[in-house]
């Protein structure tokens, strides 16, 4: 796991939780990492399709929209 756990706990608390277990933080971190990899992979495909090597914010945004469907 690469994402730090403390910020994950803050995200959950910002959503309204009073307390957050370590298991919950670790589980959300794993899920977010997997989602991040999937979104990045789709963004890479979009950039390559556009003839670019550089991933732009718009590639990420479009990739996220595709996953929301």
Curated annotation (Swiss-Prot):
Instruction: Give me the Gene Ontology terms describing cellular component.
Output: chromosome; cytoplasm
Q: Which residue positions does the secretion signal occupy?
A: none
Single biological process term from Gene Ontology: protein homooligomerization
**What are the UniProt keywords, alphabetically?**
Chromosome, Cytoplasm, DNA-binding
The subcellular localization recorded is: Cytoplasm; Chromosome
Interaction with DNA as annotated region, ranges = 19-21, 53-56
Q: GO molecular function: any one? A: double-stranded DNA binding
For this protein, the record's Pfam families field holds: CBFD_NFYB_HMF
Q: According to UniProt, where does the site described as Interaction with DNA lie?
A: 13
How would you summarize the oligomeric state and partners of this protein? Homodimer and heterodimer of HmfA and HmfB. Heterodimers may be formed primarily when cells enter stationary growth. Dimers then assemble into higher oligomers, with the DNA wrapped around the protein core. Higher order oligomerization of these structures can give rise to long, superhelical fibers (in vitro).
What protein name does the entry list? DNA-binding protein HMf-2
